[in-house]
A protein has these predicted regions:
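N-terminal Rossmann-like FAD-binding beta1-loop-alpha1 element of flavoenzymes
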Residues: 8-32
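Glycine-rich FAD pyrophosphate-binding loop
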Residues: 26-45
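Glycine-rich FAD cofactor-binding loop and adjacent beta-loop-alpha segment at the N-terminus
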Residues: 45-73
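Short beta-strand to alpha-helix junction loop
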Residues: 59-67, 123-139, 235-240, 299
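Flavin (FAD/FMN) cofactor-binding and adjacent substrate-gating region
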Residues: 70-148, 271
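C-terminal catalytic lobe of FAD-dependent flavoproteins
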Residues: 139, 258-316
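A conserved short coil-to-beta-strand element within the FAD-binding core of flavoproteins
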Residues: 149-161
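Flavin-dependent oxidoreductases
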Residues: 162-246, 251-259
């Protein structure tokens, strides 16, 4: 590596782009984010979110998710971050086994029958980070600024505008790369005042177009969700929101008649496998970091650390 660290351009200001930029800046690299959507406009802003590395494929997923879990747990003591450790239940309407990652987290145990909501026959309890994404993205933005990084609003029409570019554009990578392997999955959730719910709930049915979950985040609670492949509009659908509230209230009666404060809609960038890869484009270096589906938060720090290692090994 040269004595003076080269500037790195990060494309995308969602959780993957911000986390990657933070890691690079704190490692000493001059970093600039260029993003068509600022953090509060991204799909990441619309996420629930909970650490749950589900429906993602890559040989390094276990390592990335474990690294991210460690980072998030370390942030729970800082009230600025929006990260809290929350206990809850994941349950299935049919007999299901817990994923291996769930068995390794804090307080894991199988549920007894009387702990399960009506209509559910299997489940498990555990404690994991739940993340208030608007607050968390603000924290990451401030952390980036403190480390000397900047965020500019703008659109990249090519992958190689700088000697080193990190592509964290999510669904937009479909056109930018181009990568037709990326498929959009529209997700919608509801934000409401929290009537006193302290534990999360998540339905274990990854094939459902309407997965039921709720995530308490202090004074408010996030209710979900939906999964609509191929749909890319981000206008909230009132019928979807009403169905979400009804399903969540069937699990937790205190959510009946809850006061709704907003809706969020995002486009998950699903792909057969996560792409974290270093390639050369027109003599310049491009490091891809996209295709995380609904697990962008859960893999964010692990992928960002790997990108930082890749950049650190480049000799210009």
């Amino acid at each position: 590596m040269t004595a003076v660290l080269p500037e790195v351009l990060v494309l995308g200001a969602g959780v993957s782009g911000l986390t990657t930029a933070v890691c690079l800046a704190e490692a000493g690299f001059p970093v600039r984010i260029l993003a068509e959507l600022l953090p509060h406009e991204t799909t990441s802003f619309c996420a629930g979110a909970i650490w749950s590395p589900y429906l993602v494929s890559h040989p390094h997923v276990d390592r990335w998710s474990a690294q991210t879990l460690k980072e998030l747990v370390g942030l729970t003591g800082d009230g600025r971050t929006g990260v809290r450790m929350v206990t809850g239940i994941e349950a299935g309407r049919t007999p299901v086994e817990p994923p291996e990652w769930a068995t390794k987290v804090t307080d894991f145990r199988l549920c007894t029958g009387d702990e399960l909501p009506d209509g559910f026959v299997s489940g498990w309890r555990y404690t994991v980070p739940v993340i208030d994404m608007p607050q968390y993205l603000s924290y990451l933005s401030e952390r980036l600024s403190t480390a000397g990084g900047t965020i500019d609003k703008g659109r990249a029409d090519a992958l190689d505008p700088a000697p080193i570019t990190v592509n964290c554009t999510g669904y937009e990578a479909r056109a930018l790369v181009p990568d037709t392997g990326i498929e959009p999955v529209r997700g919608q959730l509801v934000v409401a005042e929290n009537p006193g719910v302290a534990e999360f709930f998540a339905e274990h049915d990854h094939d459902s177009p309407a997965p039921t979950y709720y995530l308490p985040q202090g004074g408010h609670i996030v209710l979900g969700g939906s999964a609509e492949p191929g749909r890319v509009d981000r206008t909230p659908d009132p019928a979807v929101s009403a169905a979400i509230v009804a399903r969540c209230a069937a699990v937790e009666p205190r959510l009946r008649g809850v006061r709704i404060t907003g809706d969020r809609v995002g486009i998950r960038p699903t792909r057969p496998t996560v792409r974290v890869e270093h390639v050369r484009e027109n003599g310049r270096h491009v490091i891809h970091n996209y295709g995380h589906g609904g697990a962008g938060v859960s893999l964010s720090w692990g992928c960002a650390r790997e990108v930082t290692d890749i950049v650190g090994a480049i000799d210009l």
